[in-house]
């Protein structure tokens, strides 16, 4: 489907460009304007240059991923690559979906060996986030994840990625868990929804847990409302459109400053424990720690509905306060 006509003035484009550039969406921004007159503007050229750089980085990432899989397999470890390249490969150009590290999932009994591999000199420069469990898919066993995974081409190497249903659920819950502050996360879901195969098993994706199903459907609803994602399964689409109005408003509020530096813990001025000895600045920093309502809902295992979010936000604060106090008491 051709893109819709773009109604954006040069001034509006100039205002939007820093948000695109700093939020990781510069490549997507260029892709959208590359066939319009905006490509000739200074902002258009800035996004074009960013796209070229992202294309180079995508090639470097692919080379490193191939190396990591060779190193792991040489030690008898078979990993699954999550997020990052596993999603970027589905875009028209890998440069449209930048990422910084490589999330690798391994069976628990392989973790020690896998950790030794990524700490080795041979893996130097490969930034790996190694997992032996996936919190977002806590109700799914490692063996089921591997049984449903599949091998795909990454250059001259076969790379293992999650099954479509597992990966969609992971990406959806990960987005909500982190407050949906990064726009590209929702673009990922939109891409997956619109390119979904006819045999995609929604029952498997939603799982048997009603809370997990609620979370995944909430993310689907956001993808429909905010990035215009369409989908073939009309029953799921109807269920997803029942998301509460506050949810989309909260995401748009986050997108006003979609930068990693504005997210916890980087947005915190000092570790909370430091205020126990030096309380100056405590109250001003406390305001920066008030939780995003989306993040708060997931953190206390709540549901996305029309009820007020204040109880969930207070619950999140109590959880964090408990984590702060209990280790201190144990040390005493």
Give, region by region, the residue ranges found by the protein language model.
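Conserved NTP-donor binding/palm subdomain of two-metal-ion nucleotidyltransferases/polymerases, i.e.
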Residues: 1-100, 106-332
